[in-house]
Amino acid sequence: GLMDVLKGAAKNLFASALDKLKCKVTGC
């Protein structure tokens, strides 16, 4: 359903934001 799509998009955004944060902290 639509909620599943939104949840998936939110998860992807969260994951990429987490990756960027990790890069800032650990320098990738």
Curated annotation (Swiss-Prot):
Paired cysteines (S-S): 23-28
Name the tissues where it is expressed.
Expressed by the skin glands.
InterPro entries, per the entry: Antimicrobial_frog_2 (IPR012521)
GO cellular component labels: extracellular region
Report the locations given in the UniProt record.
Secreted
UniProt-listed GO biological process terms: defense response to bacterium
Major place of localization?
A: secreted
| UniProt keyword tRNA processing, yes or no | no
**Keyword Disulfide bond on this protein?**
yes
- List the keywords (alphabetical): Amphibian defense peptide, Antibiotic, Antimicrobial, Disulfide bond, Secreted
Name the family: Belongs to the frog skin active peptide (FSAP) family. Ranatuerin subfamily.
Q: What does this protein do?
A: Has antibacterial activity.
Protein name, UniProt field: Ranatuerin-2LT
Source species, please?
Rana latastei
